[in-house]
């Protein structure tokens, strides 16, 4: 039976909080029905409605405010069916506000309540970009351009123009040559490779050659991918375990403006979500040239009061190389989940194993002189093997005006990697091949809580949380090798690295057209290094404090303006914090600063003024106290001088009609060292201009496909800018047809015009047999794959 509670109008925020708490306790399982004081003057009216999420599911626990005048409001809560109601309230024009943590606040102005009648006002709330929630369907995010009204996109949700989401549909429409290509759906993000396919990719964003992930933080299904203090390179981010068909959505944010983002996020952070359930079981078989074969089997079913998802991927590919990659991997995902966006629990297990040979970057002079071909290897015994096993759990609970989220994870990780970048420079007899070995167990825990408050008559969404991570690395080794046989051990370290963080953030509606987001973050690290070179053993416990501030103006005609500023950081290899001597020569060395400050600022605009069309523009600046740059001699990244980057990004997405979408992104940056050195101030490998454009077709008659263009601009390869890489372009094609409702075929063509360009270029010294002992400085490149074809047949049961 519906219950009614009589109460007086709320005049102050404190009284509103007290009455809200009392009402929440009384109406836990029933819809809220609010009556005015019996003495309130006529005329009166009633209001009722249902609140749902953008997947049409009822949202319980939503705070519904009926604002009669400034500082005068009635409050109700939705029940388990998402219903709310107000009875016998003053008639006339009112304002309605719907608020719940994890979803964008919806405000409706000038709602007319006619005397003696009941007005219905339903509402749909949309997930905020920070809500990595438990979902039960394929889509975490709708295609934003397809939503009913322009206000239903990121206007009113995002805190910067370079915050965004990528939908599952957008991921599905893209051809993926390798798993990490999914990340190229983020505007301005590029992916390449300088070695074998099983190795972590090269990433580029905001003027950075990020190597394997130095300044972009990546998570998949809530579990971090970046590896600090890694055998091959700081922040190593291997995403070969990613299965594109399971992606439910991607959230991205760029710049150091977000309190919940810590290490490696100075340039940006990308969170890839996985589905909890599939609409139907699928079997997808793919074949292509160069020995490409792939099978994917996935499905979900009801189990033990929840949903059980399972997926298995089998993969093999040789690539266009004279010495075949022979990359073989097996990849499995299992997930059990229960609940919904507001209250849910999920456990996910991921298991990945890969083994491969690799053709590393090769000297340009060796190709020019006819010693080797573009797809030949200097050392055909290079390669690697890796595994990643992870188990994680996520729990989320939403109460009245609050939301709590808890996550825990454990990762068992291993890598054996053999590379030879300098040929015969260090060892003219045996060659310069070296092995990098990494064995670690990663454990982590994080929790956060959000509150909806009213402070001095202003709506406030507050968030606080902490994060804890430990990397126990019993083996962190560097060996000199020949044909993968160990000749000598250079480094054999045991490192325990622990990091903890506390953060807080508040989003305050300062004025009707002004929102302020204030955040602070504190990080504390502990490095414990036990080295085979005793002088390099030791401990260090550094910390860093990072304030953030964003201002959002608008919306004005479905347009918002953003001002963002903040500080962040990236960590350096923990062994640098205790380093005192060179492990080979024992010559004295200076310790490396373990935590490097980043300072950033941004001005941006977002507009959805035209139906179906979204555009964002940002001008940004980012300073680093120390740059991480690639070292050809060491084959990894090393700390260097302080730097500054300035640039702009322009991203556009247009849903032309129900079957055609267009997108185009353009980014440019200028990167320079800010500390003087006579060798020059250009940052080697720093990306300048990038662009991408595409069209996607999804016709009801059964045809679907996409055509995509990518431009990778030239880059300085040496500090004085005397040697530069050439620009490259690539066009990829996808074409498919639905033979039946459950069966479709797809053809992907990569490098459609068979461009002979480089995936990456470096400039450093190497030595081929017969050359001077001090070597030859030269461009070293890894070519883009030749034109290749992949066909797939997919069936949904």
Tell what function each PLM region has.
Residues 52-57, 63-67, 99-101, 114-172, ...:
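Short, acidic, small-residue-rich periplasmic hinge/interaction motif at the N-terminus
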Residues 152-155, 160-164, 177-227:
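Extracytoplasmic beta-strand/coil segments of soluble accessory domains associated
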Residues 223-254, 272-273, 365, 592, ...:
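Short acidic/polar hinge/loop motifs at secondary-structure boundaries
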Residues 289-316, 321-359, 382-403, 451, ...:
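Transmembrane beta-barrel wall of Gram-negative outer-membrane proteins
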Residues 344-352, 384-532, 609, 613-619, ...:
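Face-selective signature of the C-terminal outer-membrane beta-barrel domain
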Residues 394-398, 403-422, 554, 560-570, ...:
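Membrane-embedded beta-barrel scaffold of Gram-negative outer-membrane proteins
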Residues 448-452, 512, 516, 614-625, ...:
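Gram-negative outer-membrane beta-barrel transporters
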Residues 714-715, 737-797:
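C-terminal beta-signal and adjacent terminal beta-strands/loops
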